[in-house]
Amino acid sequence: MWVLLRSGYPLRILLPLRGEWMGRRGLPRNLAPGPPRRRYRKETLQALDMPVLPVTATEIRQYLRGHGIPFQDGHSCLRALSPFAESSQLKGQTGVTTSFSLFIDKTTGHFLCMTSLAEGSWEDFQASVEGRGDGAREGFLLSKAPEFEDSEEVRRIWNRAIPLWELPDQEEVQLADTMFGLTKVTDDTLKRFSVRYLRPARSLVFPWFSPGGSGLRGLKLLEAKCQGDGVSYEETTIPRPSAYHNLFGLPLISRRDAEVVLTSRELDSLALNQSTGLPTLTLPRGTTCLPPALLPYLEQFRRIVFWLGDDLRSWEAAKLFARKLNPKRCFLVRPGDQQPRPLEALNGGFNLSRILRTALPAWHKSIVSFRQLREEVLGELSNVEQAAGLRWSRFPDLNRILKGHRKGELTVFTGPTGSGKTTFISEYALDLCSQGVNTLWGSFEISNVRLARVMLTQFAEGRLEDQLDKYDHWADRFEDLPLYFMTFHGQQSIRTVIDTMQHAVYVYDICHVIIDNLQFMMGHEQLSTDRIAAQDYIIGVFRKFATDNNCHVTLVIHPRKEDDDKELQTASIFGSAKASQEADNVLILQDRKLVTGPGKRYLQVSKNRFDGDVGVFPLEFNKNSLTFSIPPKNKARLKKIKDDTGPVAKKPSSGKKGATTQNSEICSGQAPTPDQPDTSKRSK
C-alpha cells in the first residue's frame, strides 16, 4: 500500500469529536466478505535495464521522414499521424484530417496513440511501421485494462462511495469538510470533479477515468487521521502507484485550453479551479515523480504553472519536472508565507489569481544577476533545515555532521575490505528511500538478489528466514519503495552506465544513485598507470552527471592497502587525489576489530563541503537485522576533528557526566523527525 503522510489543519474545534472519528476511521483491507486477500499481484524484482537501442530526437525525425510519416515538433514529444488508428478515426465531420494523434517521446522514443490507446517502445513502433512481427504483438501494444482483481475492487469501492453532500447526517458532513479542509469548497466543485466519499473508511475518493471518459480505470482514496492537534492524510491508490497514471481533472480539459496549473494534491486542484476558473491537473505521485507516460497529455499547453507545495522540496521538484516539459513554457509559484498551498490559500482568504500572476519563469539565460537570485537566496536563509537536505532517521549523528542529504552532490565512501561497506551503504540508502527519495542501485560486486535480501532484512529489522509467514507483508511494503536496480554485474563501460543513469533520471525521477563499487565497474583491463587516469576520468564524469541532473551520486571506492594498525585517511582512497577533490562529502568506515577486537567500528566524515563540519561517531552492528544501530546514550559521543589527518579529539576530563567542550558534542541517540515531503502549513 502506498502511504504518504501530510500534516494538515488544526483540530481545536474538533477535539470533542476526535474520539468518534478515530473510532470509525480506517480503510478496510477488503470490502467484500471472506478472508483477507492480497490487494496486488506479485511482480518480479524491479530492475532497471538499459534501453535496447537508445534513440535521439534527430534519429526519430529522420526515420519518420524516411517512411513518409507526417509529423509536427512539440515541446517534449513529436506528433505524427497514427498508423494504429483507422482513417475514419483521424477525420472530422468534414472528412479532413484534423489532428495528429500519435505522440512520440523525444527522449525515449516511447509512443502513445490517443485515438487507439496503442503504446509501446520505439522498437515496437519501428516493427509496426515496417510490418515486422505478428498481429498478436500489435494487439499487445494496446493499453491493457487493469488487473481483474483491481477492476473488481475499483467498481466495488466506487459503487459504495456517495457524494459528500448526500450524507444523511449533517454533523458528519461538517466533520468531513473540516477534516479535509473543504469548508470553502462548494458542492458544485466536488460534483464537477466527480469526488465521492466512502463512509466505512472515512475517505475521499478521487476517480481515474479513461481518456474520453469511457470507463473507470482506478481510484485514489484519501483518508484523514487525527494526529496530535492536527490531521495527517494517507493515500491509497488502486492500482498500485507504479501503474497509477491518473492526471486528476483531465476529463475537464478542453482542446482549446492553452494554460494549465499542475498541483501535487487533488484538494489543491479543487481549490484552484473553483477560485480561478483555470484548468487544473494533479500529478498522480505528487512531488515524487512525473512519469513520462503523462507527457503527451500536457503537449497542448503553451503555459504550464507548477504550484506543488509550500516547502523547498516542492520547489526543487517543480524545477526538475519543468526540465521534462520544456522550461520555456513553465512557470513556478515560489513557496512563501504569502503563497501557501492552494487549499490553504483559499481557506485563508488569499487571492489565488494574484499568486499565479507572480509565478516565476523556469527558464533563464546562462548569465544572471543577483536580482534574479535574491529570492532563492532568501528561500534558503528562511528554510535553513530544508536547504540542508533530507535528514536520516536511522543515523541522527550523521545529521549532526552532514546536516542532511542534498541533491546534486557527490559522496565518496570507503572502508577496509570486509568492514561492511555494502551493508552500511545499503541501510544508508534505504533510510532515504523509505522517506521517498527515488533511488537507483548499481551493484557491480554482488547480485541484485543478494542485495535485495540484505535490504529487505534491514527494512524489516529482523531476519525473515524463521518468519516466512511474514514475508509477504514485508515484501509488499518493500516493493512499494521507489527503489530500482541496474542489471549490470562486473565490468561495464562508463558510457553504458551513464546512459542508464540518464534514462532512470528521466523516466523515474531518480534523486540518488549508488555505485558499488568503482573498481568492479572498471574491471582490470588497464595497466596501473592507465587505470589511475581512467579512474580520474570516470570520477569526473560522475561529478558532471550529479551537477547537470541535480542528482546525488554515492561512489563506493576501495582504499589502497594500509597497515592493519593504521586508520584510513582521505589520502587512503585508491588512485590520485581526484576522488577527494571532486567529492562534496567523504565518508570512511573505520574498522578497528583487528586491533581492539570485533565490533569496534565508527564512521568518519572527513570532508563536508556544505558547511565544513567533520567528525566521527561509533557504529554498532546488529547481526540479526544487519543494521548499524546507534549505541546507548551513555556510550555515544560525537567527536569533532579539525582535519582528516589529525588525531581524534578526546573527550574532556571532567567530573561531570556528559561534559563537553566546543569541539565535542554529546549524541542524544534519538533520531530527529525527518522532513516530511509534503508538509502542509496549519491554517489559522
UniProtKB/Swiss-Prot annotation:
Segments for region (Contributes to single strand DNA binding activity): 1-121
Q: Name one GO molecular function term.
A: lipid binding
Region Required for hexamers formation and DNA helicase activity: start-end pairs: 121-372
Regions of biased composition (Polar residues) lie at: 659-677
Swiss-Prot/TrEMBL keywords: ATP-binding, Deafness, Disease variant, DNA replication, Helicase, Hydrolase, Isomerase, Lipid-binding, Membrane, Mitochondrion, Mitochondrion inner membrane, Mitochondrion nucleoid, Neurodegeneration, Neuropathy, Nucleotide-binding, Primary mitochondrial disease, Progressive external ophthalmoplegia, Transit peptide
Outcome (variant: residue 374 to Q) = In PEOA3; reduces helicase activity and alters nucleoid structure
Pfam families listed in its UniProt record: AAA_25
Q: Where does ATP bind?
A: 415-422
Q: Which GO terms describe its biological process?
A: DNA-templated DNA replication; mitochondrial DNA replication; mitochondrial transcription; protein hexamerization
What disease is mentioned for this protein? Progressive external ophthalmoplegia with mitochondrial DNA deletions, autosomal dominant, 3: A disorder characterized by progressive weakness of ocular muscles and levator muscle of the upper eyelid. In a minority of cases, it is associated with skeletal myopathy, which predominantly involves axial or proximal muscles and which causes abnormal fatigability and even permanent muscle weakness. Ragged-red fibers and atrophy are found on muscle biopsy. A large proportion of chronic ophthalmoplegias are associated with other symptoms, leading to a multisystemic pattern of this disease.
- What's the protein called, per UniProt? Twinkle mtDNA helicase
Supply the source organism for this entry: Homo sapiens
Q: Which gene encodes it?
A: TWNK
